[in-house]
Amino acid sequence: IDSDDSSWDEMEMEATIGYIDAGDSYDFEVQVSLSGSYALASSYVGNSVLAFQVSDDNIIDFVEFEAVVEDNFAVSAQGSGNQDVDNGCTDQDYKVDWDVNIKNFGNLPDDFTVSFDTADAVAAAWSITGADDMTVENLLPKAEDGVYSFNVEMTVPSGLAAGTKHGFSMTVTSVGDSSQTQTQEFSATVVHCYGISMTVDKTKDSADPGASSDFTVTVTNDGNGEDTVSYMTMGAQAWTPSLSEMSSTIASGETGQVVFTLTVPADSSAAAKSGMAMVHAYSEACG
């Protein structure tokens, strides 16, 4: 309550008007404003009565005003989002879940319809539980902490490619005012997992002095996404170990080949051996 009148004392909530001639009148204007967003609707708790006392030395009178708080409908849905799932390199399905809160942000009790669109997840054979259409009834207003909580769960199949993403949506609508609606998205994304395996066409070979011997190394990308594999050799430098290439970019489930070559030193004797020589392969996950 406030007033622009010069007689108004804001601290005392009082106006001292002074002398008014008999038969005259004095217009005193006050402004009544609603502060904050938690005031309950008059249709829910009734109107607020504001009383003013008017007095001089001998007569006391009261003036009453009735303040009406209009209905206000609003909704807030919380708990949605995307979750990363790391089961692309396993045979284990993985379950993700969300704790969902539907809050009445209005100023009177309200019902809310909750509907789900699960077409995307269902088409990908990702099963969902807890996503049943429903009506939440008589949810208390914001000032009384009206909230309805539930859980939704989705199963992500194993062995999927990196970046695979599916999900569903939820729409919450106020019954009191259908223009008050909110849609939330729920999804899961399969993250990139890495793995490689190696085979070689032979582990021993022979060659004349000054000649070379080739070993074909096959690398399989066992991860669920494209991987750039780097190679490194180890072996006696006199036998000049070398590789046909230093890296290969390999799609998931595919193979890449690199040729490892050892050259017999020209001055080698018939019994000369290279000793242990190795090829190391490093997935890009190794940094």
Q: Predicted segment positions?
A:
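Long beta-sheet-rich domains in secretory-pathway and surface-associated proteins
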Residues: I1-G287
